[in-house]
């Protein structure tokens, strides 16, 4: 993987996680980061354009089909998150409570899809991780704890605003990273029986 892809992917991950600390950042900063995410995702797609060119080529097994479904679904949900985010902008005054909640619901759905997307794309690396039998259970347990701490289900179903967690932006971000790591671990449980 080239350095540009790595830098863009890391920035995407960091900014996306920060966005879930909506309670702890200025609304204007939240929107600026959102614009940054849109720019980065366009760049990300451009850097991975060869993947899209190969979609119609070759045979599809379950793993490749699953990866394609996750990637396309994640892209669609991300676009919807951006659309409703723009409609909900404090500077446009064209949104409503409905657009705000749809923005939030798609945003929280994106967390789950982010975990699935990363899992399908870094799958080969999982087999190389040492002490998987210790690390994966820790990821899963902490991920479940994080889901509870941020009351993820009620956010996903639109029952609450963007965040009701207490603490600070760092703690809140760690919780969401924990959720992503949990999903990655769950989708790579088969690696526990493989030797490094």
Residues of each region from the PLM?
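Membrane-embedded alpha-helical bundles that constitute the cytochrome b-like, heme-associated redox core
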Residues: 1-196
């Amino acid at each position: 993987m080239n350095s540009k892809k790595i830098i863009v992917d890391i920035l995407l991950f960091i900014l996306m996680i920060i966005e879930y600390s909506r309670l702890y950042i200025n609304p204007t900063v939240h929107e600026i980061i959102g614009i940054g995410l849109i720019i980065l995702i366009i760049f990300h797609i451009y850097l991975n354009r060869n993947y899209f060119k190969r979609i119609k080529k070759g045979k599809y097994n379950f793993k490749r089909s699953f990866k394609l479904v996750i990637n396309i679904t994640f892209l669609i949900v991300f676009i919807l998150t951006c659309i409703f985010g723009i409609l909900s902008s404090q500077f446009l005054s064209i949104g409503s409570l409905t657009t705000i909640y749809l923005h939030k619901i798609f945003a929280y759905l994106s967390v789950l899809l982010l975990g699935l997307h990363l899992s399908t794309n870094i799958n080969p690396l999982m087999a190389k991780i040492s002490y998987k039998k210790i690390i994966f259970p820790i990821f899963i347990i902490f991920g479940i704890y994080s889901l509870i701490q941020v009351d993820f289900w009620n956010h996903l179903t639109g029952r609450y605003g963007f965040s009701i967690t207490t603490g600070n932006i760092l703690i809140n971000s760690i919780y969401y990273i924990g959720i992503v790591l949990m999903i990655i671990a769950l989708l790579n449980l088969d690696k526990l029986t493989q030797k490094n």
